[in-house]
Every structure is written in C-alpha cells, then in structure tokens.
Amino acid sequence: MVNFTIDQIRHMMNMTHNIRNLSVVAHVDHGKSTLTDALVSKAGIISKKAAGDARFTDTRADEQERCITIKSTGISLYFEYDPETIDKQAAAPLNPTEEGDPTEEDIEIKQNSYLINLIDSPGHVDFSSEVTASLRVTDGALVVVDSVGGVCVQTETVLRQALAERIRPVLSCMCNKLDRVIAELQLDPEEAYHKLMKSVESVNVIIATYPDEAVGDIQVYPNQGTVAFGSGLQQWGFTRKFARLYAKKFGIDETKMMERLWGDYFFDAENKKWAKTDKKDERKAQGKKPLKRAFVQFVLDPVYGLYRALNEGRTEKYMKMLDTLGVTLTSEEKDLRDKALVKRVMSKWLPAADALLEMIVLHLPSPVDAQKYRAPLLYDGPEDDEACTAMKKCDPNGCLMMYVSKMVPTADQSRFYAFGRVFSGIIRSGQKVRILGPKYSATNKSDLLIKSVQRTVIMMGRYVEQVADIPCGNTCGLVGVDQYILKQATLTDCESAMTIKMMKFSVSPVVRVAVEPKNPGDLPRLVEGLKRLSKSDPMVVVITNTEAGEHIIAGAGELHLEICLKDLQDDFMKGTPIKISPPVVEFRESVNQATTEPGLAKSPNKHNRLYVNVEPMPDGLAQEIEDQKVTPEQEFKERARYMSTTYGMDVELMRKIWAFGPNGNGPNIFCEATHGVQYLNEIKESVVAGFGAACAAGPIVDEPCRNVLCKLMDVTLHADSIHRGMGQIMPPARRVVLGTMLKAEPILVEPVFLCEIQVPRAVSGGIYGVLTRRRGHVFEEIDEVGTPMMNIKSYLPVAESFGFTQDLRGATAGQAFPQCVFSHWQAYNGGDPLTEGTKTNEMVKSIRNRKGLAPEVPTPERYLDKL
C-alpha cells in the first residue's frame, strides 16, 4: 500500500531542507534499477516481494525485455524516518514558505519526513546523454559499483560527469552484489574486504582528480557511513547498522565504533584491546592465529555465517542466529526455501532501503545547501544578478529560474512533458514564462519566446500526478510548452535573467544512418516523426540534406541508433514502414603539414585577392576547444597567453584570432597575420562566413574540418566598398581555405572507441584476433585478483565497430562483455587519400559516392586562382 498522498508530497516540497534530489548512476548491469526498487518498495509503491525483480523505474517494454535501462526515469518518494537514528545535526531550520512561518504541522513533518526526488539513469554508454540530463537536475549521485566487476569504464565516465557538475557522489557509493562475492567467487572474508576496499579506493582516485573548495571533501569513507555494502537483487544492505549494534552491546560511542569498522583495526578478544596490526609473527610464536580485522570479525563473519547457513538449509543454525539478532519469521516465511528464503531473511535483518535512506538523508545536500555552490557554476550570467542570487538562496519568493533538461513523451507519444528542475521561485499552472533557448545570450536575444504553462505535474515513474504549482528545489514536468522547446531550455519570469548553461555530453553522435519511407506518400509522416524523435532524445541529431533529399539520424553507437529507429517507426510514425541504410561513420578532414606558400583566391569581379596559409594545430588544442577550455568568449589576451604557454604558439598571432569554425565554436581557428592592410575590418564578417562554410564541408569528402589553423597572410582590396561586399569576399574566402588545405597534405580523420572488455581469463585469447581484424589494438590488461575475470582495454575505430559485440561473443563462447565509449579522433591509417589505390582513397571514393559527389577529389586548381 502506498504510504503517502500527493498532497503530502506537495506539502513536503515547501520544506527545502528536507528534500534530497539524487541520480542513481553506474556501469551497465551493476544493479541500479534493482537497488532503486528498494526505495520504491519502502515508499509502498511496489510490494517487498516484487522489489528487486520489478525494476519499477524501467518503464518501457524494451527496457524490461532487454533488462537494461534506456531512458532516465524520475520519481518522487515520501519517507518518514525514525528521528532517533538520525543525527540531530541533520535537522536544519525550516525555510519560511510563501504562506509565512512554518506551522506546527510543518514542524512535526520536519522532524521525520523527507522528500526524495530520485532519477534512475541508464548504465549503457550509448545512453550517456540521459545520465547527463538527470545529473543536471539533481544534487547528489548514488554511485553503484558491482563488488565483483569493480569500477568499470562507464562508472568512471558518469562519476566524472557528476563531479564536473559539482554533484556529491552520494558519497554514497553502494558496493552492490555482495551476494556474488560470497556465493560465486567464494572469497574468504579477508579477501572480500580487500575486494571491497579496491572498489572504494578506485572511486576515491577518480574523485581526487576533481578537487573543488566550494564543495569540500567529497571522497567516500565507509567508516563515516558514506559507503553502503549489500545486494540490490536480494534487497539487503548496511552502513552504520553494525556500529550501532556493537556500540549498544559494548556500551561505547557509535562514532568511535564506526571508525574502527574499516581499515587496519584489529580486535584482541582475549585482552579486550584494539591493535593497528594483526600481530601475525608475535601470535605465531605463541601458537595463536593472527588477529582478525574488525570489519571481518564484526561485519563480514556474521553476514557470511547467516548467508551460508541459509544457502545450505541448516535450519537450526540460522534460526538460532536470527533469535540472537532479534529477527522473527512468520510461519509462511519459515516455509520458504533457497533464494526466496535468503532474500526474505537477509532483507529483514539488513533492509537495503533503510541503509540507503540513512545515507541519502545524512550525507546528501538539500537544495538549499547544494545551490550555494552549484548556482555560480550553472548560471551563464553575472554571479551577483537577481536570478543567480535567487538560485544561490533557493528562494521561493525570488524570480523563477527553471532548467528543462529533457523532453519525456506522454503515454500516447503525441505530446511531451518538459522535465526539469526549479532552482528558484515557484512555477504555476497557467503562468506566463520566458522560454530562453540555447542560442539566447546578452548579445543575441532572438532565441526567446513568452508562453503560458498549461499544467505542472509530478513525475512518478510511469505515471504523472497533477499539482497546482511546484516550488524551488524540486524536479517536475510541464505540459503545454513542448512545441516551443527542442531539447533543453531555461524558463524564467525575470527580464534580466540569462540562461542556465547548456549541458555538455560525454559522448558524440558519430554513427549515422539515412532513413526514407518505403512509400513516398509517407514522407510528411517521416518528417514529423523525425521532429518528435529529435525532441525525445537529448543526444540524437537529425540532419536533413535538402540537396541530396536524404534524412540522416546520428547517434552515439549501434544500440543507441537501434533504439532511436525503433522509437521512430513504432511510436512516432505509428508503425509506418521505413527503409534504413547501413550505418556509416562521421569522419573529419584535416591537414598533415603546413603549406610552404599561401594559396590565392580572387573575388568574382577580380578586384580583391585573399592569400591564406594553413597548418595543423598543436596536439591537444582541438580537444580543448571541443571541451570548451578554449572558447571564443574568453578574454583574448588571456587566451593568447594560455595558448602561447601551453602550446608554444605565437602570442601576437593568437591575439588576432578572427573566428573558430564551424558554427563559431568548432575545433578550427582563423587568424589574421597581415601587415598594414586598409579596409581589413570591413571584410572580416565576410571572410569569417567563408571560413565557417569551408570548415563545415571540407575539400575531400564534404565532412567537417578539425584541427586546422588558417592564417590570412595578405589581402588586396578595391578602394570602393561597393566592390568588396559579402558576395565578393565570402566565396573566395571559402575557396582559398579549401584549396590551400588540398596543398597541405590533407588527411581523413576517424573517430575511435575506447573499448573495455570483461572476459574470463580462460577464453580471452579469441579477443586479440577479433580486434586485429578490425584495426583495433589492446593497450592495457588488468587481472581481477581473486576472480577468473580480466579487463582488457583497447582502441577500436568506430567504423569497424558494427557487429563487433557479436564477433566477440562468438570468439569467446558468449562470455565477453564489451563496453565502447567514444575516446578520440585519429588519422585514418590507410595511406594518402589523394593517391589512387590506397585504402584511404577507396574510403574517400565510397563516401563521395554515397553523398552523390563526383568520384574524383577536386585538385587545388579548382579552388585557387593564379596571379
């Protein structure tokens, strides 16, 4: 039975000190959704019996079929928590609500009630954008780590994303699947301790690379209750439970006991003394066994003892243990056998939901605390303006600031809920709001609409509940604004407010397919379906090539594309049949060396001449531009100094950067290196437009350029301005960049996946052959000590990744589990793209043929002029 009403949840929304917003993040298959079930079950939404198997937050049919989470799902849960077991420090003063001072009812609620806005996010790397969208609107992250597999590539990726957003990794790293350590690996308790310690240390190593004074120390410490251990599937787990138990038994302080239950603390039962070593040699001489580690003696030994007694069906032993522990079983529960018995008994003794709830309440920040340090990072305007001040205070009486991070389709797929977080103010049904799009800025205010919100709703997993308004510090859905928002937006009622920064994704949409309807008459339905698909997924990119008449969908990987195409056909086109091209990969064009002499292009009227040199940029600079560490908005002297000291570039030249391209922020740079040219500033806009067009479609295969530095060496201009307008300057500016690139040893650049493969050591030999055939190579092998598994890290070109998983499973009898995440760009290793017969040249021809271009690459003479 559900333990709360929507009215209670709405009432709790005013109590910002008692709200916790968190995302559950982890590597795929590490047990996020089963663990989330524990909290959903405690709130009474699903039965305890179903918890762990129901995966309530996996709302789509294909999520249940595939047993993986595809879309992040939000749910608001109301909990009453026993105040005796909560630190008194956790109780903070109430925020006065709009209605005035807190009432007696509020104070009563304050003592033991909490609202947890939880988002269960996907673990598969192809759906990383869903994780980014959920992290943006939450303040903490429950990082789930498989006790057997340890910290994997995606654990690391999502943890880094969380830290970059100033999100506390719920300091609550849940070492999950402890049941597998006991039953499958059959490690003894001391080995199990070292296995768990390795997982905790791996998480802390990643956290240590993101020091941030504003957030403070966010490393995870089991002896402070910020790490839980347990099993999501069997619904048991613990943090402080054992410390509380022994503190009561021995009559000592719980905090002191907690400190000694992790690390190098050993208890000498004979002398009733603590030691920092196991005194192995000393005790061996006395004919005694070494001292046991406190975590092993007081925590793992009882867990192992009960677990094994239950598994082996030793009724007398486990009933005696349960009697000692104060756990009583009903007659129905006593009749259970095998896994059902283990799950019921362990979850009764060590309920996972209680451990998680305690960790969330005590160690996660409330919106009031979190927004103090998150608001300056997220807000794209001055820190002292009205909007940012309201966000920092999480002020319900301040101006409205809400960030929409994703669009969630309604049950019938016809409309969308705009899902996001209210950072300040209150959003109401019927309220008029300013919708600021991603291009809105202080200088460009065109991306702005003023519209009314029809309804505000609370997202409850697969259901929604309507409420009149939502105050700050909460996540919610909006109805009626979906046609004005593509993917992300800022909603405000303050005229001076700037946007909340757009999200940065950890993956890139590098895999593409072209789609067309089988029946040409269904083209309008396809176009409408593509619009809805683009809205429904934060990452997918839909490109319409009007010249070739093709519609392209770009995704992060094979699985991401497969899900997008299924959604397009089944949901957004209601089953209309479509034709899908084989997947292709996005390439980039670049140059391998600097030109020895500048290329020349003349304007159509022959009165103006542009001379340009091109060269490759220093290694790493293009990546920093893509990561927005070097941006067009930076102060130009400071940026020039940084590029000079970091990359050894000419500081004077770097002060004269005219543009980044394409789109004004791409990984190519155009600099002005002329001397004493008249009217130069008058043609700047036209030259930059030409450079942007050249960067958007390079000379070899019409793909975007990357890592190209263009220098304008000289210009000859007509004295009369009418002869040097946009139409006269932009075409030669584009041509001179393309032509000069062809003289600078052009290269094709391809995307590369970092592929982490978990595989049993016995069958790992087959992996190397599969990788070699696909131009991949292994760069690191890690043995999982104490297990038959090993981790193989390799690089694999994205172009060779199609069907890789099937090949790998075939070569390893189905036992290899790969995870591929976009890593970097590298030159296509197949010879000169312009030389007939090379592998790269064949690739160039196939791309040109697919795009409907002439098979031969143009020569420099096609673009450049002679004196």
UniProtKB/Swiss-Prot annotation:
tr-type G domain mapped to chain residues: 17-368
Gene3D superfamilies (UniProt xref): 3.30.230.10, 3.30.70.240, Elongation Factor G (Translational Gtpase), domain 3, P-loop containing nucleotide triphosphate hydrolases, Translation factors
Single GO cellular component term: ribonucleoprotein complex
Chief location: cytoplasm
Keywords from the UniProt entry: Cytoplasm, Elongation factor, GTP-binding, Hydrolase, Nucleotide-binding, Phosphoprotein, Protein biosynthesis
Species assigned in the record: Blastocystis hominis
Keyword match Nucleotide-binding: yes
Processing after translation: Phosphorylation by EF-2 kinase completely inactivates EF-2.
Lineage: Eukaryota, Sar, Stramenopiles, Bigyra, Opalozoa
Name of the protein: Elongation factor 2
CDD domains xref list: aeEF2_snRNP_like_IV, eEF2_snRNP_like_C, EF2, EF2_II, EF2_snRNP_III
Record's function text: Catalyzes the GTP-dependent ribosomal translocation step during translation elongation. During this step, the ribosome changes from the pre-translocational (PRE) to the post-translocational (POST) state as the newly formed A-site-bound peptidyl-tRNA and P-site-bound deacylated tRNA move to the P and E sites, respectively. Catalyzes the coordinated movement of the two tRNA molecules, the mRNA and conformational changes in the ribosome.
Residues given in the record as GTP binding sites: 26-33, 176-179, 231-233
Record keyword Cytoplasm present: yes
